[in-house]
Amino acid sequence: MSKEKQLVIRPENELDLKEVYKAKNGRMKESFYEQELQKLHIELCKLQNWVKKYDKKIAILFEGRDAAGKGGTIKALKEHLNPRGCRTVALPKPSDVERTEWYFKRYISTLPSGGEIVFYDRSWYNRAGVERVMGFCSQEQYKEFITQVANLEHMLIASGTMIFKYFLDVGKDEQKRRILRRKTDPLRMWKLSSIDDKSLSLWNEYTEAFEKMFARTHTHFCPWILVNTNDKKRARLNIARDLLSKIDYEEKDQTRVCLLPDPHIVWQYSEYQHHNDDPTQEILRQFKEHKKAEKSQKKKDKKLQAKEQKESKKELAKSGKDSKQKELKVAKESKANQESKAKDS
């Protein structure tokens, strides 16, 4: 994995705010998002070619709150990948037989083979999140999981599997808005589950469970990467950047595309305490500051214009006065000349 430091100037930082974000809600514009995502898709295809060529194994775990955008992110990342070399794992609840077996058994068979990338739409960390909060596992089962998971991940990494763990976080109000939308949008109703409504009322319980999960399972060899997904488009671009920046594959465009992610969107759990703000609100604040600056500049320009007009009028008045005096002088001299000629004659 690349540890080289980069001086990062992202495309969104080079353009005018209005070209990248919507002034009404601070979220990324579709046009800019699609333009940047296309560049990242090309790099993801290069990554997949490298994975296939060298029989690499990559497992990408997506955990997070309900309606945080896990499925949509996976769909965006794998849109142009060869389906023969990548797949998505989204297991249903355990069967009666699976409940009697070692918890990790049903996940072992889903792990990537050589030359394969596997995306997990929720993973074995279900036990530390939804299963624990909703009471779907006992305290003994939870303790067994939490003491074994780091060792399992260490063994997988030692055997050549690259693991990336992303936790997608979303604000309480935004989560509520998305869940309500699922209830009314026929094209999104399939996403609605029986526990979605309960997750809204159990916000604090989930927060506590996730904090304990991070504290026990965030390791130097397999860290948790947290992502603010209040703006889904911004989140997806920066997840792709983060993933690509951590793998040294062939023909990588590290100077223009594979940049380090925006630290306001993506960060390691160890830096979690510094990221409590909604990035969309920061964009709205910048729009407000720009609007204020534009208004102030217009006011200054108006004053300057009025001053210039006043000075111009004074100049014109002075010029007119000088012209009149000159005309009087010429007339006086002409009269004097005429009188002199008359006298001589």
Annotate each language-model stretch with its function.
Residues M1-S345:
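Glycine-rich phosphate-binding loop of ATP-dependent small-molecule kinases
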